[in-house]
Amino acid sequence: MEKNVIKSLIIEYQQFVEKITLIERDIHLSDQLNYVFVGLRRAGKSYLMYQQIQHLLREGHSIEEILYFNFEDDRLINLSVEDLDLIKVCYEELYAHRPIFFLDEVQIVTHWEKFARRLTDLKYRVYITGSNAKMLSSEIATTLGGRFIIQNVYPFSFREYLKANDITVEPAWYFKNRTEIVRSFSDYFYFGGLPELELIEEIEKRQWLSNLFNKTFFGDLITRYSIRNDLAMKVLIRKLAESVKHPSSFNRLSNIVSSTGIKVTTDTVIDYLEFLQATWLIFSIENYASKLVEKVSNQKYYFIDNGLLNLFLIDPETSLLENLVAISLKKKYEEELYFYHQNIEVDFYIPTKNLAVQVSYSLKEEATRKREITALLKIAKVMDVDKLLIITHDEEEMIVEDGKEIAVVPIWKWLLEQDSLLENR
């Protein structure tokens, strides 16, 4: 590739990232560490990179220090790892600064990881995004050799979603603009929080989500993992969506898929579940009360975004509610999040925070109310839990029973105030 082309692209990209308008994500990065941004397609990995660039500029760095390169640019064809070195050389011919590297979709270049390792060995700061189809596998993390922090990039939180829609969440929001916030929640609940959806008319959102799923399915799953039985994978995804509130063992999922006339082995299902998680379509949580083998083989599976889950549901409300709670808890607690099933059925349990959470669309039916309260009182006794919470669609109260307080909170309020509701009681 010619030097003059590379130099012009470096300058063009600098002008672009300096001026682009952003919706600030609630993600804060250290200026002293190297990062790989991972997540679902269109979750905002590149925009998080732009956000970090603009943060560095506000901190006093010059735009000339920024070496941002978008390897998906149509003007870049058949780049080699030697071209990566040439990009560095061209930058050094333009500027006397020590660059901060932002390599967007760099996985397109074969052996890119060798270049990334070399940069970190030379003490450069490096930020990387990449396609799930070629990058989000365990071998890449191993290849990078612990030199990078893996930053998970999720779709918008509800607070970020409101910010994208120019709705301010002030300290007194519950009294000032609660009606506007509740009205906006419906879209977020059914269509999810992928950033680009904010630019799309409501009538077209489902089609956009369907297109995204198909690109992820064929590009990140079928092609990346050389899956020959794509119909079996589709059936598995649909069955996971239908079972989103319940534990699903490997054997059960294998039997369910096979019952449709598509024969798959348990080992194949295990592989497929691993692939689905690697491409960020789903995530799983384990049963805290299970023995080690059962923790792995009988998990609960949730979708990374409500909009994608809703593609597969007919009566979606109860599943979407629990899925949205799962997403928010997963973002906050990561591997500390469990469910608890052992003579008690508790939807979510975070032992490090002494917290148990039930999810119920409504407590108006007496049987439902009794079931949810009883489960929390039992786990409070068995595991000495002192923070008890029921998340509903739109109901709120404080229940006091057997000397325990159980907060009942609507989902839209909990999403905006969960820090205080979860940990400061």
Model-derived segments and spans:
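Interdomain motor-coupling "hinge/lid" segment immediately C-terminal to the ATP-binding subdomain
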Residues: 2-13, 133, 139-247
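Pre-Walker A adenine-sensing motif
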Residues: 13-32
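Hydrophobic anchor at the beta1->P-loop junction of P-loop NTPases
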Residues: 37
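Walker A (P-loop) phosphate-binding loop of P-loop NTPases
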Residues: 41-42
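Conserved lysine of the Walker
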Residues: 45-46
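Accessory nucleic acid-recognition modules appended to NTPase machines
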Residues: 65, 199-356, 361
